[in-house]
Amino acid sequence: MAMVKEKEQNTKDKKLLVGVIWNFSAELKLTFMALLVLCTLATLLPFIPSSFSLSTSDFRFCISRFSSAVPLNTTTTVEESSSSPSPEKNLDRVLDNGVIKRTFTGYGSAAYNFVSMSAYRGGVNSFAVIGLSSKPLHVYGHPSYRCEWVSLDPTQDPISTTGFKILTDWGYGRIYTTVVVNCTFSSISAVNPQNSGGTLILHATTGDPTLNLTDSISVLTEPPKSVDFDLYNSTKKTKKYDYLYCGSSLYGNLSPQRVREWIAYHVRFFGERSHFVLHDAGGIHEEVFEVLKPWIELGRVTLHDIRDQERFDGYYHNQFMIVNDCLHRYRFMTKWMFFFDVDEFLHVPVKETISSVMESLEEYSQFTIEQMPMSSRICYSGDGPARTYRKWGIEKLAYRDVKKVPRRDRKYAVQPENVFATGVHMSQNLQGKTYHKAESKIRYFHYHGSISQRREPCRQLFNDSRVVFENTPYVLDTTICDVGLAVRTFELRTIGDRLLRTRQ
C-alpha cells in the first residue's frame, strides 16, 4: 500500500515539473540562447586579432556624421556683401592681344578685421570703442568705421555718424594694432536722452576696392534707465577718487615680495582717496595674488584677468589696448589718472605732499614724470650684511645710475576727462596743455628688472657713496630707502601681519 502511494506521489511531481517548464518555455529558450552565444564568444575570443577594437571614437564618428547633417542657424550682418563670402575661382585666360590674364583669389583670414574689447560712453553724445585690428590693414590699407545707435524705443529712428579712429601704439604694433574709435554724434545734443535704452553698433569696413567687406558689431548695450547723465557734468558730480592708477599688462614669474613692497608704498603715497587697477596677463600667480588679496578685500585694488588677449599678437601683451580700456572705463571716476609700472616708485620732495603737487599742476591736462634709474643688483650695506639681507628691497637698493644718456623714458599722469586716447609714456590725443618740467615736483625711481627676480636682489654689497659696477657709475641715493620703515609700519597697521612670510 505504501509503495502505491509513493508511485502516485512521484507521478504528481513529474507532472508538476512538466507544467512549470511548459508555462515558461519561451523564457527558458531565450536563456539557453544567451548562454549559447556567450559560450561561443568565449570560445572564439582567443582567435580574434589584437588590433581589432571598438572605441568611443568609433561611436563619436557615427554621431558626428549624423549631427553634421543637421544645419546650424547663423545670423550674418551684411553691408554690400556677406562678411564671410565664398570666393569664386577665376581661371587664367588669354586676352585678345595675347597677354595671359592671371587671377588671384583670397581664402580665409590672416587676422581679424576688428577684435572688440570694450566700449564706454564718453559724454552725453559720444562713445569710445577699444579693440584691436590688423596692423598691415591700417598701415597699408584704408579701413573705416561707422557708428550707429539703435534705440530700444521703436518710435526712434536709428542714427549714425562716422567713427574717428585713433591709432595709439606709435608704430609698436605686431600682427595687431590698438584702435580707439571715437563715435561722436555731433548732430544731436544727446544720445538716448529719454534713457529708454539702446545699442551702439560699430560697422568696420576693410576698404578692399574689389570686395569691400563690412563687419557689424554690437559693442555696447544700455538698458533702460541705466545712464546717469549727471556723471558727464563735472560741475554736478563729485569724483569717487582723487587718484587712480592704471597698470599695464603683468606677465611672467613676478616676485611676490617686490609686488608687496610696491603696493604698500603707493597705497600710503596716494592716500585714502586712491585706487589701483591691475591687469593680469599671466603674471598674477598664486603667491602674487596672496599679496594683493588683503588690498582687494579693503577695496583699494581691482584686478582684471586679461589672459585671453594673448590669442591676439600685439605689442607687449597688448599694453596699448589695456591702458586705453582703463582710461575710458574709469574716465569719470577720478580727477587724476597715473600710468607707470610696478618696478617704478613715485616720490615728491619731503616738504611736499602728492595733494599739494597735484594742486600746483591743475591747469595742465597732462604732465610727464622724470626717471631716476636705480640698480636692481647692488645694495648699500650701511648696517652690515646680516641686517641688510633682512630688509625690504627698497630699503637697500640705494644706488642710482648716473651714466649720461641722450634721454630716458618718462611716465605721466592725466586729467582723464580731457583725454581721448593714451599711450605708454604719454598721451598725444588730448585737449589742454602738457607740462614736461615737473622734475622739481615729482619723480619716479625705476628698479628695472627687479620685479621679475625670484631671489634676493643684492648681488653685491657696497658701503661707498660712489661705485662703478660693470662699467656703469653709480651714486648713493637713499631717497626711497629713507621711507622704507614707514612703509613697513603702514602695511602692518593697515592689513596686519598676514604677509610677513612672503617669499622673494
Swiss-Prot record:
Single GO MF descriptor: glycosyltransferase activity
GO cellular component, one term: Golgi membrane
InterPro entries membership: Glyco_transf_92 (IPR008166)
Highest taxon listed in the record's lineage: Eukaryota
EC number: 2.4.1.-
GO biological process: one example: cell wall organization
Residues spanning the membrane: 30-50
Organs and tissues of expression: Expressed in root caps, mature leaves, top of the stems and seeds.
Membrane topology of this protein: Single-pass membrane protein
UniProt-annotated location(s): Golgi apparatus membrane
Alphabetical list of Pfam families matching this protein: Glyco_transf_92
Family recorded in the similarity comment: Belongs to the glycosyltransferase 92 family.
Name of this protein: Galactan beta-1,4-galactosyltransferase GALS3
Organism: Arabidopsis thaliana (Mouse-ear cress)
